[in-house]
């Protein structure tokens, strides 16, 4: 695949993630910006309104063959004070998300405590 085609494929997925977040978070489209391909840092730049609802640092990968460990490391390096999350996609497969296992379990523990009426 040509470099330009690969970048276009990545850009489409990055914009898809952006659009999904805008819709689900109910924020203004200008509150989440898609970073240009090849630029350093996290893939989605969020304004305060979006970050308050979704305190994560996003890395997007749309590749047929992917090193998840390198992708996770890249997301962590770019995450600053936010939890790193990697959105991954390949042809004819649904998108997936990679997060730290301990973080994911803690999220679930919070949900269980809320369901049980405990704080």
Q: Locations of the language-model features?
A:
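Catalytic phosphate/metal-binding cores of nucleic-acid and nucleotide-processing enzymes, i.e., regions
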Residues: 1-119
């Amino acid at each position: 695949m040509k470099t330009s085609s690969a970048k276009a494929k990545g850009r489409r997925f990055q914009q898809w993630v952006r659009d999904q977040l805008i819709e689900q978070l109910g924020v203004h489209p200008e509150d989440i910006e898609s970073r240009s391909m090849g630029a350093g840092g996290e893939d989605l730049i969020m304004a305060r309104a979006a970050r308050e609802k979704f305190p994560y640092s996003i890395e997007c990968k749309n590749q047929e063959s992917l090193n998840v460990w390198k992708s996770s490391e890249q997301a962590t390096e770019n995450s600053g004070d936010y939890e790193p999350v990697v959105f991954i996609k390949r042809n004819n497969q649904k998108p997936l998300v990679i997060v730290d296992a301990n973080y994911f379990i803690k999220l679930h523990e919070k949900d269980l405590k809320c369901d049980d009426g405990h704080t």
